[in-house]
A protein has these predicted regions:
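C-terminal regulatory/oligomerization modules of transcriptional regulators
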Residues: 95, 99-167
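N-terminal leader segment of winged-helix/HTH proteins
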Residues: 1-22, 155-167
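Short histidine
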Residues: 1, 8-9, 27, 31, ...
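Basic, amphipathic "hinge/linker" alpha-helix immediately C-terminal to the N-terminal HTH DNA-binding motif
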Residues: 23, 73-94
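Canonical helix-turn-helix DNA-binding module
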Residues: 45-72, 76
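N-terminal helix-turn-helix DNA-binding core of bacterial DNA-binding proteins
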Residues: 13-52
Length: 167
């Protein structure tokens, strides 16, 4: 079976949508701030973003369901921005980018360090895993047409993970 190379159709790949939503610096920095517990407009300004850009990026993240905008219970004139389940699902991508930056950018580990709450040990590097849990290298991977995949066995749940095409 030959590796799938063409077409790189943007309609069969989740990457263009992800880039439409998150594909610029401020969106990722706002997401990082939200993961660090910031919830208010004034707090987000602390990352060095201009007010107009902040308002625009927050609106976009809310529009795409990454953040939810909620009035504060104690003062209905103020709002909070909180991560949704869709936003929390971006954590592995955020961590992979952070780890890449640590390795190839600054050359030093970031601080603070993200640890496992249970044993307070640093998390492992983000990796690509096979269905059976094996860590895969780039050389272990192959793009194939989704129609070539075997259907799930009887009683086995269908794979609801990423598509097997990309752009």
């Amino acid at each position: 079976m030959d590796q799938l190379r063409e077409p790189l159709d943007v309609h069969t790949c989740g990457l263009p949508l992800a880039l439409e939503v998150m594909g610029e610096r401020w969106s990722f920095l706002l997401l990082r701030a939200a993961f660090n517990g910031l919830t208010h407009f004034e707090e987000f300004l602390g990352i060095g973003i201009a007010r107009n850009i902040l308002a625009s990026r927050l609106a976009k993240l809310v529009e795409h369901g990454i953040l939810v905008r909620e009035p504060q219970a104690d003062d209905r004139r103020k709002v909070s921005y909180r991560l949704t389940a869709k936003g929390v699902a971006l954590l592995p991508a955020m961590l992979a980018l952070r780890q890449w930056g640590e390795r190839y950018g600054l050359g030093v580990p970031s601080n603070p360090v993200l640890v496992d709450r249970r044993d307070r040990r640093p998390i492992a590097p983000i990796a690509v895993h096979a269905q059976d849990g094996r860590v895969l290298d780039y050389a272990d991977l192959l793009w194939v047409d989704g129609a070539e995949l075997d259907p799930p066995a009887a009683g086995e749940a269908p794979d609801t993970g990423p598509t097997n095409t990309c752009c």
